[in-house]
Amino acid sequence: MRIRTGSCLCGAVAYRVEGEPLRVGLCHCADCRKSSGSAFVFFAVWPRRAFSHSGEIATFAGRSFCPACGGRLFCLQQETTEIRLGSLDDPPSDLAPDYEVWIKRREPWLHPLPGAGQYAEDAD
């Protein structure tokens, strides 16, 4: 079984996740843009039971981060964990987005990803 590890910038918070993600996506919503400081967030969703972390985390608006360096890492939900893929220790070059959400807010210079589902808002 594949194990992926990740951490914040300062290393105070680390995590590991086992297996393959349920789905991989890009989000262009205003909240993701503001919390990341970028035009979109590249993320993947795993079952909650496949995820574990160490170190103290802080959470704001459902998004967990390191209180020391501010690194945004994951969103813990009841059944799933959404991980920001830029926080992985090894680049996730084998993971490609299955879908894009909040494309009504996507920058006009960004083109739809071929083969990825396109959703004006959240995917249901």
Residue ranges and their predicted role:
Residues 1-124:
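A short Gly-Trp-Pro
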